[in-house]
């Protein structure tokens, strides 16, 4: 049975690596194989195929509704409100369960996320809303580094996103018991300094936690404590078990399950709490039936049941972090008779390191020590005090306030120590991309040395480690980063870099420096920007200038706009050499302007190949450039002016540049329709790429010219460009 469960889990998990979403034809083929496999009693292969078939059928079924969106961007929907989270005072993020799309029912009812930038009336969870919204399939930025936005959305079960245009009707739902309880607790803890943290620990309401606090928790490794997760549900379940022992084994099981269910309900049945509750349910069923199963069998059953309950859970980082952490604990118990707390923490630190690097591209080196001290404080004092306070809040306000005050005092101590540590030390260490394979190989070698059956891995592991450390010659690379509707171009060689433009920043604090540029620089091991070029002052080009200047050293700044006294003004005729490349400023003729036509146009050449960065220049500047440069504008690759607007890319300019490759830096399904179809037609003799559709572009020199690799041309199905959700018989590039 255990190998069958493991086979099912492996089959289901393989969906993370599929290059495309298989069609029903593949499902039919798998079904036809099940009968002979069952006849031959090859159960491992049978359950492996069952896992694959389960994911294929479920993903195709749950994503099929996206076909109905078509090319239309505005839709009328009726949906049930799941949550409304304010992002500061800028907008409200609505989580909606859609029942009708354009007045037609939707099955199964999908989960979508809609941003509302206008004022909304107070709405209760469960209210039915009819609204008009832009709507597009789940999408995220696609770069070598930074969060995978699409996988993040799918991991939460969200399959489409949009912006609210207008509300047609709201049918308010009665205020639920959770909202009444939350209101009573909020009144009790309102005067306290750390009320938002108490709301997060008890009800999973995280909107009041600041970005600085999240950064602090990430650096200290305490994010898993603040965000309600399996650890919290397990703690409450254990508390219920302890209290229920007075009523015998089955009384303890019922009390434990009841406590876990109530806490999950308080947290709004968030995805992480649902997973933990199912694990508690699996364990409870086994204990109720008095089955004495080993821990790893319970682990396998929980994995399979969760996959059956919510196939999208496999795309959640929290799912893998929690299950891998439990697997490591089981392994420690197998290798050590009585492991100490420090041994457990060390194994968790090392075992989770590759996954943490893959997901977050950095480590918190002090996390083990901080967790050794903080976790007992939270589990023994802060969380129990806060939860008992919540239970008492509706009836005994003063007593609840006293308990909240004690929990708040503990939170104050923790934050004081963490802030002091953050002032003295760098808590979060972003690491270059090569750390991931290196740490994975080292961990594999260490594990093989510790566990006798795995020692055959030592030799191949050492050989792979040698290859990973073997130095390779550095050559220049150019990346047009996927920054949505904006521009950011990174030119690098080894650990040296020049950055051209910085992308946009948005209401609520989200910005392309923290989301894309800084992770990309860290991934490449770049710690200093040799030259920062800001083409002009528009926010989608210069929006993150201050953030970058504060985040890392910049040796020289060049711009067409005088941002500060340290900014060198960009002017035609400027030239310099850098790492074997020649840079020439072709425009503007007169510095100091801030309009599109004043943008800093730069031509980069290695003597054989050339790239033209054309900012947001339009017809007037293009005409003058053609007159000044003529055939000198000819370039191998062009980053199109003004994101592909029809006010730019005039036929004379297109003919003069005569690029073989053209990259349009434009957001996915942007409101301006960039690049415009007529502009795309003007470049019909060149290969064209759009960052919003195909992700970041990696440009490298080759003997034949320049190679362009799109981020969405590689990787699993959910990272692909085009209609990634559509099942296919075969992979289509």
Set out the residue ranges of the language-model regions.
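Membrane-interface helix/helix-cap signal primarily in integral membrane proteins
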Residues: 51-224, 510, 515-524, 528, ...
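N-terminal leader/targeting segments
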Residues: 1-69, 73-74, 151, 161-168, ...
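Hydrophobic alpha-helical segments of integral membrane proteins
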Residues: 15, 19, 32, 36, 174-189, 197, 205, 213, ...
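Hydrophobic alpha-helical transmembrane segments in multi-pass membrane proteins
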Residues: 3, 40-47, 162, 210-370, ...
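Non-globular, low-confidence helical/coil segments that flank catalytic cores
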Residues: 78, 118-134, 152, 172-173, ...
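Alpha-helical transmembrane segments of polytopic membrane proteins
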Residues: 22-32, 321-322, 371-379, 433-436
